[in-house]
Amino acid sequence: MGRKDAATIKLPVDQYRKQIGKQDYKKTKPILRATKLKAEAKKTAIGIKEVGLVLAAILALLLAFYAFFYLRLTTDDDPDLDQDED
């Protein structure tokens, strides 16, 4: 019976450590929250690489269309010039 009573009573050192742990957690909680928000913002933010890749893809498509129409028009003009000269 004496052992049960002794187990429920905590040592003052353990109580002190628990109290310090609670205070430390309360202090670091806003810091942890701010760090978590920074990491989340970094993950969801559009980076320069993604923007550059999108712009490069659009530029490549525009150049492809331009080259297609340029080559299409120049091949049509060449036979007409040859026929007029003869």
UniProtKB/Swiss-Prot annotation:
Compartment annotation: Endoplasmic reticulum membrane
Cellular-component GO terms for this entry: endoplasmic reticulum membrane
Assigned keywords, A-Z: Endoplasmic reticulum, Membrane, Transmembrane, Transmembrane helix
Domain of life: Eukaryota
Chief subcellular location: endoplasmic reticulum
InterPro entries hit by this protein: TRIQK
Protein's membrane topology: Single-pass membrane protein
Bilayer-spanning residue ranges: 51-71
Similarity remark: Belongs to the TRIQK family.
PANTHER family tied to this protein: TRIPLE QXXK/R MOTIF-CONTAINING PROTEIN, TRIPLE QXXK_R MOTIF-CONTAINING PROTEIN
Task performed by this protein: May play a role in cell growth and maintenance of cell morphology.
The protein's name: Triple QxxK/R motif-containing protein
Organism: Pongo abelii (Sumatran orangutan)
Lineage of producing organism: Eukaryota, Metazoa, Chordata, Craniata, Vertebrata
